[in-house]
A protein has these predicted regions:
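A well-ordered secondary-structure block
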Residues: 80-158
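Short, well-ordered surface patches within globular domains
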Residues: 18-89, 134-136
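Bacterial signal peptide processing site
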Residues: 13-17
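C-terminal motif of bacterial Sec signal peptides marking the signal peptidase cleavage site
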Residues: 7-11
Length: 158
């Protein structure tokens, strides 16, 4: 039964055994498909899911939620942002919660946002920036009141 379960798990993501490419079944697959389908319709390249960069995206989403719910403390947000992104080295976030994106601007773009109000348009607002990305990080965080927030970040890893 364990072999069958493993076969089913790897079949869902094209047969990969690379742990960085295996997508959780929490809506991530649908998000990545929507991004890549929209990109294809716009004549843009595809991005590849990354568990590693999804964890960075999750930490950034938690940091943004702290800002959002605890009085919009920009200095604290920025300090935590720098800590989280320090581990990226030369990798840059080019879409989503970028270094230059103020938390309020992110809120206005609806990325991050509640899962229901998330706007995919923000990902493609600047096609030249989108084209810099090779990897995508997807994160969902459920708040204490049960609201699910979603964030998507695109990463330039080359």
């Amino acid at each position: 039964a364990g072999v069958l379960a493993l076969a089913m798990l790897t079949a869902c993501d094209g047969g990969t055994t690379d742990p960085d490419k295996i997508m959780p079944e929490d809506g991530t697959v649908e998000v990545v498909m929507k991004i890549n389908n929209t990109a294809a319709n716009k004549g843009l390249g595809q991005v590849e899911y990354s568990a590693k960069y999804s964890e960075v995206t999750r930490k950034l989403l938690v940091n943004w939620l702290e800002w959002h719910t605890n009085g919009n403390q920009n200095t604290k947000y920025r300090e935590e942002y720098e800590k989280i992104t320090a581990e990226l080295g030369n990798v840059k976030i080019v879409v989503g919660l970028t270094k230059d994106t103020a938390p309020l601007a992110a809120q206005t773009n609806y990325n991050p946002a509640t899962r229901a109000s998330f706007k995919y348009d923000s990902i493609f607002a600047d096609p030249s920036t989108y084209e810099l990305a090779e990897k995508v990080g997807v994160a969902f965080v459920t708040t204490s009141d049960g609201t699910v927030y979603q964030a998507v970040c695109l990463f330039d890893v080359n």
